[in-house]
């Protein structure tokens, strides 16, 4: 919360544009967040910062210890800083910056007669191009570490684990609150329900079950990924001394490999993507079930055979995978996008609203932008249902177009990395031009202007509602 002390009437210690409440330490508004992932917990901290009462319900029994790495760009960090100093402090404690001022894009497929498994040149391979990353300004970290830091910053009792949402009621035409029912038979109530429950959001499923059933569940993109977090020494052995310390993308036909350092350059996050023509069959072996699991057992030998013709450094990375790596199906909502992110007193954020493939590496960052926009809107609202609805609609108005663009562009970017995007193919010049334009849309975003637009739209809706009832 903040405003510059150089401005007339500024509050000491608060930056320009901060949302400052004048009606006490806490509002009468209560918010229930379903889903305790990165976006849900960041939103909770942002609401607490604005004096809003919040409860988070997470289906997992405890904090997951999945060693998945991911990265945040500069726009996401600006959103964190404005959400709450506690969010920014959390990421600063666990993240590391890219060592060099550019990202590297490599031909991971084409071998040459000079290639030798043990040579430095072989591990380096053919550089297609470098792109300056000062604008993207990546910070990388382990998901579990960042989440744990944010959880510790929340007031005790804010998060309840082991709570899986079964259903909810939003009696908008009455004065009753939104009521949540959990699978263990317990209930809860709040003025607002926010679904931050990810790809297979239970809140999304109920919100659109009758009106738009086709959007209730995401669709398989025919890409599967395999993840590994490996020691830096192993990565240096596989790729040489330089590559592991920077964002690297190895491109090629029907597959691509992303790697970048995490944990203060002690570890390297490796993500291998492979395109498959066949439908997704999950670990149950049943492709007909309506909501398949997103993971299934993998086989390193199958992957090694699939990439046997790729360059040595890529094969070396694949060798670092466990013998039975988990295969993660890549699902998104590109085929059936949700028509809106809020109705009544129920809203969706992050993957629950706009599940995207990970090829831009921006899904979590866009979710944090969502969290800021929603925290600003709800931080201005009262417990009155018209005020809540106005806040949620202001959030929807500001966030919908940008986040829907991400879904489409990320899917296309996955094809660009695999040399099959129409009109681009494997041409490095065209690949670079495509990526530069898309990345500019991601980083060239004014989060302060976004927050101000949320305020303006909220106030306009409240004024319109008030006028209509006079």
UniProtKB/Swiss-Prot annotation:
Organism field: Stachybotrys chartarum (strain CBS 109288 / IBT 7711) (Toxic black mold)
Role noted for this protein: FAD-dependent monooxygenase; part of the satratoxin SC1 cluster involved in the biosynthesis of satratoxins, trichothecene mycotoxins that are associated with human food poisonings. Satratoxins are suggested to be made by products of multiple gene clusters (SC1, SC2 and SC3) that encode 21 proteins in all, including polyketide synthases, acetyltransferases, and other enzymes expected to modify the trichothecene skeleton. SC1 encodes 10 proteins, SAT1 to SAT10.
Subcellular locations according to the entry: Membrane
Misc remark: Trichothecenes are sesquiterpenoid toxins that act by inhibiting protein biosynthesis.
Binding site for FAD: 58, 71, 143, 351, 364
Subcellular location, principal: membrane
Root EC class: oxidoreductase
Organism placement in taxonomy: Eukaryota, Fungi, Dikarya, Ascomycota, Pezizomycotina
Topology in membrane: Single-pass membrane protein
Single GO term (MF): FAD binding
Enzyme Commission number: 1.-.-.-
Keyword set, alphabetical order: FAD, Flavoprotein, Membrane, Monooxygenase, Oxidoreductase, Transmembrane, Transmembrane helix
Pfam families assigned to the protein according to its UniProt record, in alphabetical order: FAD_binding_3 (PF01494)
GO terms of biological process kind: secondary metabolite biosynthetic process
Protein name from the UniProt record: FAD-dependent monooxygenase SAT7
InterPro entries in the cross-refs: FAD-bd (IPR002938), FAD/NAD-bd_sf (IPR036188), FAD_monoxygenase (IPR051104)
Catalytic residues as annotated in Swiss-Prot or TrEMBL: 227, 260
Record keyword Transmembrane present: yes
